[in-house]
Amino acid sequence: MTSREQLVQQVLQELQDAVESEGLEGLVGAALEAKQVLSSFALPTCREGGASPQVLEVDSVALSLYPEDAPRNMLPLACRGEGSLLFEAASVLLWGDVGFSLELRARTVVEMLLHRHYYLQGMIDSKVMLQAVRYSLCSEESPEMTSLPSATLEAIFDADVKATCFPSSFSNVWHLYALASVLQRNIYSIYPMRNLKIRPYFNRVIRPRRCDHVPATLHIMWAGQPLSSHLFRHQYFAPVVGLEEVEADGAPGPAPAPPALAPLPPPAKTLELLNQEPGLSYSHLCERYSVTKSTFYRWRRQSQEHRQKVAARFSAKHFLQDSFHRGGVVPLQQFLQRFPEISRSTYYAWKQELLGSGTCQALAPKEVQVLGELEQLPEEQMAKGLGCSSLAAASPSMVLMQRAKSYLEHCISLNTLVPYRCFKRRFPGISRSTYYNWRRKALRRNPSFKPAPALSTPGAPQPASVPEEALLPWKGEGGEGAGKATAGGPPAPHEFLPPKVPLSRWQRRLRRAARKQVLSGHLPFCRFRLRYPSLSPSTFWVWKSLARGWPRGLSKFQTQAPALGKGGLREAKEKQEKEAGRDVTAAMAPPAGTPLHVGASPGEDPGKAQGGPSGEGAMAQGRPHSRSLSSRPVAEAAVGGGDGQVLVMDMLATTKFKAQAKLFLQKRFQSKSFPSFKEFSALFPLTARSTYYMWKRALYDGLTLVDG
């Protein structure tokens, strides 16, 4: 019977023969055959044959490079072999000798070939690993290595895989990742306290690709030739074992090395220096340590002094926003007494930003009462709700967060779901992820929550609910129009329509300025979203269509409906200029059984907002009431005018685009080939990076993005 060593030698020989073929097709075929051979026997879990392990020797070079932040009471050992000794080090750690190094090499080659896409793009740490690969051939960070394209990295990967088939080759970072998957163990990659600019990419815990149990951890150290006090060149890997393991194995004590670790030169603890001396400048630091300017400022942002300044600035800004939403701005003197570290110019810049954003909405008496009750919560209850101490909850930012969380929980307890855009207007300092986390927890506490239907028939009994004035989640959504009903039908009941509030002077001025710039053609969409975040994207496209003179009156929805008369077309053409600033929600969700209404400006005559008898009003009345609610708003919005058509098509395209992106990520996740953000953004360029990582985190947490 063929022995284990002969089978491994045969597998390696077949892989070496396949290297000569062009491309990776022959090598992948040989890897599939090698997998069948190697799967016939598993790696042993303990030493076979009862032979005593080889005499352990401490690697003095690796010991002098052993970093201070690595695990204590451990020693790097010396290995015998060729190349970078990665597989020899793993064999010594697991079985006490280098007898299984060739088998580990063969299994690693098979792993890297059969899961090539995973190691290049699919895994969570792929970006960190690829960055480490860029720096593995140099000791300093350089622009040339940082800008290596993905095609070059794939070529390096293929060359490394082919070279790994030969025992004298050198290993790279992805060999560590593949070896961790082969051994089903974590690998603690210990990197010396040298090459500080690239050290974070190498000094980390590497986890296997898939593991069904809680994995143990192997410690492997990067060792090599020291070049200076802060530089070294990697040459080989050294196994690191604990002192108690050496004593338990009965191995003779390491005679050449002293029992205690020799004192190492102190590393460059720049972050601690910045915490001790906040005024430390880069010119003083670069004389003592090899630190680039970008690294220095990144560490400076992490220093304690900078974090305190950022926290104080955050609290001051949200205190000013809170006072502004209450109906008035705190005077400068009172603001400086409370926050003396904030400058006068910063105060006026924030004040002008608040006044120009158009978010100042008058609070209704009921809402003031609700917010007043939320403010009267005791500090212990606030601290309990946010999971922090009462001293931390007393800060203005914690008070704002507690008020926002209590407001959202109160709305859900009243069977009302506040959309994020309305919640953002009320509490601009709360992020989207925080809002959805709070909403998910509040919905779990209220299992009987059922949101009220958006449309209902006039004859159906209305459930008892809290008056909308107590919550006012939709008050800030109104456009310039007040929403008038068209002729040809009875006016809609008041309880079916969302409350409308006329726009303030600042909002009208803001919309006029934005509309003028869009119509002039000098404001692109990206700059429009940055300069006017309170205006919806559909408003931009409506104004853009007016500027370009697009024929928006004809659509596939209108071709299926009766043709408009000449008078109706003329009136619709004259109304396009006035309908550009109307409220979006008024065209999206008209009540069932009522005719479509179009927006009109506050000073416009209601009669002008109506279409002709043979135009929009007649078409809206001709719709049967048995029609489904899902298609009714789409058709009516398209018939009612160009604004509704552009808005509906924009919303449908956005919804379909997001659904396709979610389905794409979910399918790739199920097929174990999750795409990187670069690949994902090439297919879905309009999806933000934060949205991609939010969906990725949800999939890895076991959630489902798309049902069905």
UniProtKB/Swiss-Prot annotation:
One of its GO terms (molecular function) is sequence-specific DNA binding. One of its GO terms (biological process) is regulation of transcription by RNA polymerase II. InterPro entries: Trp_repressor/repl_initiator (IPR010921), Vertnin-like (IPR038822), VRTN_OTU_dom (IPR047273). It comes from the Eukaryota. GO terms for cellular component: chromatin. Residues 473-499, 561-636 are annotated as: Disordered. Residues 568-582 have a biased composition (Basic and acidic residues). Belongs to the vertnin family. This is Vertnin. It comes from Ailuropoda melanoleuca. The lineage of its organism: Eukaryota, Metazoa, Chordata, Craniata, Vertebrata. The gene is VRTN.
